[in-house]
């Protein structure tokens, strides 16, 4: 049985073929990321991005708030201060690059897209900010929905599943339905 080929995704006025896997390079503009080698300032972000793109990354994902288990939430203003200069610099240096903003906050998503990001990667799938899904629908950008129980502060405290595969599948189906109800096209969703 063959799988259907997904429709291309429109990103930065170009169609992106998602028939195969795409490598996403991670650029953390945060001092407390769980992956120390990905923590960067603006100049280092430009060097890291160039290397990642040369090595085949199709997407560069910029985050300014750690989502590692137990991470303490940073203020929205601090997250904006961390990510916007990086997004702006990457957009200037690599205008064809597919930039993703890793955030669960709708304001950060909106500002980052205005600065040059072309995709929103949301660990909360719209549950940590009630305005996220409507904002993404308004922005008309691809939206990465992820699964997490609780918040980064609590997600590993006592995760409980009776049937993890079915429960995660049900969760993601509910979030897909919420995105569709808000007007996000199916071919703009990444699960």
Named regions from a protein language model:
Residues 1-31, 173, 180-184:
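N-terminal amphipathic alpha-helix/helix-capping segment at the start of soluble metabolic enzymes
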Residues 21-23, 93-102, 118-119, 185-189:
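Short beta-strand/loop segments at the ligand-binding rim of alpha/beta enzyme cores
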Residues 26-47, 72-73, 98-100, 154-166:
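Active-site mouth loops of central-metabolism enzymes
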Residues 27, 52, 56, 102, ...:
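Conserved, mostly hydrophobic/aromatic
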Residues 29-31, 67-70, 109, 115, ...:
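Conserved anion-binding
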Residues 33-35, 58-85:
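Glycine-rich, proline-tolerant flexible connector loops at the mouths of alpha/beta enzymes
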Residues 34-53, 78-82, 125-130, 166-172:
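Glycine-rich anion/phosphate-binding loops
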Residues 72-101, 106-110, 137-148, 170:
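Alpha-helix-loop-beta-strand connector modules within alpha/beta enzyme cores
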């Amino acid at each position: 049985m063959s799988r259907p080929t997904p429709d291309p995704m429109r990103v930065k006025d170009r169609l992106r073929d998602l028939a195969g896997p795409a490598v996403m390079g991670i650029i953390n503009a945060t001092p407390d990321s769980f992956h120390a080698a990905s923590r960067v300032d603006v100049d280092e972000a430009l060097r890291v991005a160039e290397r990642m793109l040369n090595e085949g990354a199709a997407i560069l994902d910029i985050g300014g708030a750690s989502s590692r288990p137990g991470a303490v939430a940073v203020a929205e203003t601090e997250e904006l201060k961390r990510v916007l200069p990086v997004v702006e610099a990457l957009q200037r240096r690599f205008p064809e690059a597919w930039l993703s903003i890793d955030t669960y906050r709708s304001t950060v998503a909106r500002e980052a897209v205005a600065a040059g990001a072309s995709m929103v990667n949301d660990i909360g799938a719209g549950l940590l900010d009630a305005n996220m899904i409507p904002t993404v629908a308004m922005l008309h950008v691809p939206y990465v929905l992820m699964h997490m129980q609780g918040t980064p502060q609590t997600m590993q405290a006592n995760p409980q599943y009776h049937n993890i595969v079915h429960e995660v599948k049900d969760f993601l189906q509910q979030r897909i339905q919420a995105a569709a109800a808000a007007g996000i096209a199916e071919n703009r969703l990444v699960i």
